[in-house]
Amino acid sequence: TVGFIAAMWITNLTGNKASENQFYIAAIAAIGLGIYSFTLPKCMPEGKTTDSKSFVDLIGLSSFKLFANYKLALFFLFSMFLGAALQLTNAYGDVYLDDFKRLPEYSDSLVVKYSTLIMSISQVSETLFILAIPFFLKRFGIKQVMLLSMVAWVLRFGLFAYGNPGDGLWMIIVSCIVYGMAFDFFNISGSLFVETSTDSTIRSSAQGLFMMMTNGFGAIFGSITSGYVIEKYFTTSAGKDWHTIWLSFAIYALVITIAFAIFFKHKHNPADIEQVGH
């Protein structure tokens, strides 16, 4: 998250938020990270030794058998839908703020000039909300924390729908703040759910499957679907109808929230969370 913030500030303040130079900056950072990774200590995986593992186990495909468990399968499905929501905000958040330059009254506003910096409030919020997760987990349990995340996604998109760089600036700021809850509460509570619902021999693969459903399949689903819908229904020669776009995203998140509350059954057991270690 801190690296995310640093990248956003660097590209915006150097005037590269919309230029090809941002990819050079990312490439240099990636090379540095790759070199640093070779200096990290070895961490052997739990479970069977590699000699006794099948090829399916070695490449992590054994985790797909978790779909045979109804509750886990339902959780991974909702993870994909929430991953799509994350892709929506990553793909269009900054573009939306920058697009206010089309309106004469906002063309010279700080929101347009520093759109990426303003969006970075979302990541700053992440670092703060993650500190509140232990309290919420103990007080409400994993399912309720996930539901809070989904409600936060509804607010994230809904506030964007009505925000503007003028008297609606507060909505944009609040939208960025609630993003921290939307992102952290599902990702952390979801990871804990996987941790407490799977056997230690398959746990690392299960966590990988969780990430793949959110940042893999979810991102693909969100990108393809939103791109088609926006171009087909919400784009004209005058530009994009951002108000309706964000309202549509908010309705999407609301439907997911209601469906999750109805279909996902999970009994909170505080002892499970307390037993989770590193």
Language-model segments: residues:
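Helix-to-loop junctions at the C-terminal end of transmembrane segments
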Residues: 11, 128-142, 230-231
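A membrane-interface helix-boundary motif in multi-pass transporters
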Residues: 12-29, 228-253
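Multi-pass alpha-helical transporter architecture, strongest
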Residues: 30-42, 245-278
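Juxtamembrane intracellular "pre-TM" segments in multi-pass secondary transporters
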Residues: 42-76, 102-107
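Pair of pore-lining "gating" transmembrane helices in MFS-fold secondary transporters
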Residues: 68-89, 177-178
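Short amphipathic helix-loop junctions that connect adjacent transmembrane helices
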Residues: 91-115
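C-terminal ends and interior cores of transmembrane alpha-helices
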Residues: 151-165
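Intracellular juxtamembrane helix-capping segments at the cytosolic ends
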Residues: 185-199
